[in-house]
Structures are given as C-alpha cells and as structure tokens.
Amino acid sequence: MNLSVEIGKIKLKNPVITASGTFGFGREYSEYIDLNKLGAIVVKGLTVKPREGNPPPRLFETASGILNSIGLQNPGVDAFIERELPFLKSFDVPVIVNIAGETVEEFVYMAEKLDIEGIEGIEINVSCPNVKKGGMAFGVNPDDIFDITRKVRKATSKTVIVKLTPNVTDIKVCAKAAEKGGADAISLINTVAGMAVDIDKRRPVFENVIGGLSGPAIKPIALKMVYEVVTVVSIPVIGMGGIMNYKDALEFLIVGARAIAVGTCNFVNPYCTVEIIDGIKKYMEENEIEDINEIIGSIKI
C-alpha cells in the first residue's frame, strides 16, 4: 500500500503533517507519539528576533473551536537553529519551517538563514491574523504575495510553500499570485479572523481585540477554499482547517489536497496525527485502494 506523496522536492511517507503553531517544535509530542510516523513536521512560526507574544488571555474556547491571540511567541530564528533543529534532525521526518516577517527583507533574511541541512521546506506565513503589522497586510494583497514569494524563492534552495489567509474576498487570486511568484506548493487555510467579548467587563476577551478562529467550526470554509484553489493552480495544495479525524482528512484529499495538516486537534488529542494516519490506512484497506493518489482529487461533481 502506497501512502507517500510529494510536495515540491519533499517526499512524505504519508500525507499527514502538523500545522504550524499547535505542535511547537515537536518536543512535547515526542513523549506521546513516534514523530517518525508523520509525513512532515511544520514547526511553530519563527521571526527574526525572539518574540514574547501577546499578554494573556491568549486562548478562548468557542462553540466547536478555539480563538487564539498568541502573537507569534517564539525563540527567534537563531535560537531555533541552535536549540531546536538538532532535536528534530534526530528523527526520520522532513522538517518544514514556518516564517513570519514584518517586511519582505525579513522573510528573505530568514529564508537564507534556514537554507541549511536538516530543513526540507520553508512555509511563508503571509496570513497570520494576530499581529498588528506584517502578516495580515501581506496576505490580503496578491501583489505582495507575489513579491514575497518571488524573493524567498530566489533566496533558498528549499521547497517553498505559501500559507494563505482565508480572510480575503477571493482566495483563488491569492493562490495564483503565489504560484506565479514561484511557490512549490500552497497551504490553506490559516485561522479565520474573529473576536469574543467579556459581557461582565464589556471588553474584548483579547487585548489585541481580534483573534484567529480554528477547529471544527472552520472546516466547511477550509474545505470549500481548498476545493476552489485546487481548480486554479497546478502546484500541490496542503489542506487544513478543523481536521479532527481521518474522515475529515479524507474529505480534503478527495477535493484535491495532496497532503493535510492537523492543528487544533493536537491540543485536544496528542495522538490525533497518528490516529488519522491509521484511519486513512484502514479506509484504503476496506475500499481495496492500493495508492493514496487514487483518492486525491477523486471528487465527482
């Protein structure tokens, strides 16, 4: 049975990867699951310098989802290379690094810095809706997406993935801009912009006011957007948004995603990724499917 897929130059042993953010740098989850079983690990978003992130509260539960306002807390690109990468290199799993810059130059700087052994791919975060400057502004403008993608593509030999925001009028235009800029793949969706209010204080729950909604609540939005993007680009698409089990994952594969990423589910169930891999295998066995590629894009309209 073949579960392997290719995203740019990266060969994944199966199509299940971690979404940036909820999996940290893999250390905590390595105590629960065998990281070698994953298709790839996408690490928490990195910035040029360390960031402390937003003041608490940072997470707020909503109906069928979570709002987060983390603010890209991370140790910075240098500390990642020094402290986290050696740990990740000890596993037989491709490592993809998510980068978040406040300027085009910062994206390029990080891409150059991460063009090293042990890293297979760069995921450009043009879509994080948490930070007051940077991500959001880039991700809603197709010209900016094209510009960043083109410059990062020139700066690295690694597979370049562009992660799109759903908070746009037409995500297809953004996807085409990323492809035109030289992206090897597109990942979507990032969180959906949302907010919550404390009715006793009559204030927003988050100091930043707006947070990012993830979890099962956004799955139908994500699925629709992945379906739309697959029809307009010829590069691989990584689908994510509310995937909680193997059935959710299969929906994304059937509409045409080459791989899927698991985010919020990792918080709920640390075994989630490997359970999804096992579920896909079982589905293939029961339906006498020998190759995962028979499922990808098999939707009948």
UniProtKB/Swiss-Prot annotation:
<protein>
    <recommendedName>
        <fullName>Dihydroorotate dehydrogenase B (NAD(+)), catalytic subunit</fullName>
        <ecNumber>1.3.1.14</ecNumber>
    </recommendedName>
</protein>
<feature type="binding site">
    <location>
        <begin position="68"/>
        <end position="72"/>
    </location>
    <ligand>
        <name>substrate</name>
    </ligand>
</feature>
<comment type="similarity">
    <text>Belongs to the dihydroorotate dehydrogenase family. Type 1 subfamily.</text>
</comment>
<keyword id="KW-0285">Flavoprotein</keyword>
<dbReference type="InterPro" id="IPR012135">
    <property type="entry name" value="Dihydroorotate_DH_1_2"/>
</dbReference>
<keyword id="KW-0288">FMN</keyword>
<dbReference type="InterPro" id="IPR049622">
    <property type="entry name" value="Dihydroorotate_DH_I"/>
</dbReference>
<keyword id="KW-0665">Pyrimidine biosynthesis</keyword>
<dbReference type="GO" id="GO:0004589">
    <property type="term" value="F:dihydroorotate dehydrogenase (NAD+) activity"/>
</dbReference>
<dbReference type="InterPro" id="IPR024920">
    <property type="entry name" value="Dihydroorotate_DH_1"/>
</dbReference>
<dbReference type="InterPro" id="IPR013785">
    <property type="entry name" value="Aldolase_TIM"/>
</dbReference>
<dbReference type="InterPro" id="IPR033888">
    <property type="entry name" value="DHOD_1B"/>
</dbReference>
<feature type="binding site">
    <location>
        <position position="163"/>
    </location>
    <ligand>
        <name>FMN</name>
    </ligand>
</feature>
<feature type="binding site">
    <location>
        <begin position="263"/>
        <end position="264"/>
    </location>
    <ligand>
        <name>FMN</name>
    </ligand>
</feature>
<feature type="binding site">
    <location>
        <position position="20"/>
    </location>
    <ligand>
        <name>FMN</name>
    </ligand>
</feature>
<feature type="binding site">
    <location>
        <position position="125"/>
    </location>
    <ligand>
        <name>FMN</name>
    </ligand>
</feature>
<feature type="binding site">
    <location>
        <begin position="44"/>
        <end position="45"/>
    </location>
    <ligand>
        <name>FMN</name>
    </ligand>
</feature>
<dbReference type="InterPro" id="IPR050074">
    <property type="entry name" value="DHO_dehydrogenase"/>
</dbReference>
<dbReference type="GO" id="GO:0006207">
    <property type="term" value="P:'de novo' pyrimidine nucleobase biosynthetic process"/>
</dbReference>
<dbReference type="Pfam" id="PF01180">
    <property type="entry name" value="DHO_dh"/>
</dbReference>
<dbReference type="InterPro" id="IPR001295">
    <property type="entry name" value="Dihydroorotate_DH_CS"/>
</dbReference>
<comment type="subunit">
    <text>Heterotetramer of 2 PyrK and 2 PyrD type B subunits.</text>
</comment>
<keyword id="KW-0520">NAD</keyword>
<dbReference type="GO" id="GO:0044205">
    <property type="term" value="P:'de novo' UMP biosynthetic process"/>
</dbReference>
<feature type="binding site">
    <location>
        <position position="189"/>
    </location>
    <ligand>
        <name>FMN</name>
    </ligand>
</feature>
<dbReference type="InterPro" id="IPR005720">
    <property type="entry name" value="Dihydroorotate_DH_cat"/>
</dbReference>
<feature type="binding site">
    <location>
        <position position="98"/>
    </location>
    <ligand>
        <name>FMN</name>
    </ligand>
</feature>
<feature type="binding site">
    <location>
        <begin position="190"/>
        <end position="191"/>
    </location>
    <ligand>
        <name>substrate</name>
    </ligand>
</feature>
<feature type="binding site">
    <location>
        <begin position="241"/>
        <end position="242"/>
    </location>
    <ligand>
        <name>FMN</name>
    </ligand>
</feature>
<feature type="active site" description="Nucleophile">
    <location>
        <position position="128"/>
    </location>
</feature>
<comment type="function">
    <text>Catalyzes the conversion of dihydroorotate to orotate with NAD(+) as electron acceptor.</text>
</comment>
<keyword id="KW-0963">Cytoplasm</keyword>
<feature type="binding site">
    <location>
        <position position="125"/>
    </location>
    <ligand>
        <name>substrate</name>
    </ligand>
</feature>
<dbReference type="GO" id="GO:0005737">
    <property type="term" value="C:cytoplasm"/>
</dbReference>
<comment type="pathway">
    <text>Pyrimidine metabolism; UMP biosynthesis via de novo pathway; orotate from (S)-dihydroorotate (NAD(+) route): step 1/1.</text>
</comment>
<keyword id="KW-0560">Oxidoreductase</keyword>
<feature type="binding site">
    <location>
        <position position="44"/>
    </location>
    <ligand>
        <name>substrate</name>
    </ligand>
</feature>
<feature type="binding site">
    <location>
        <position position="215"/>
    </location>
    <ligand>
        <name>FMN</name>
    </ligand>
</feature>
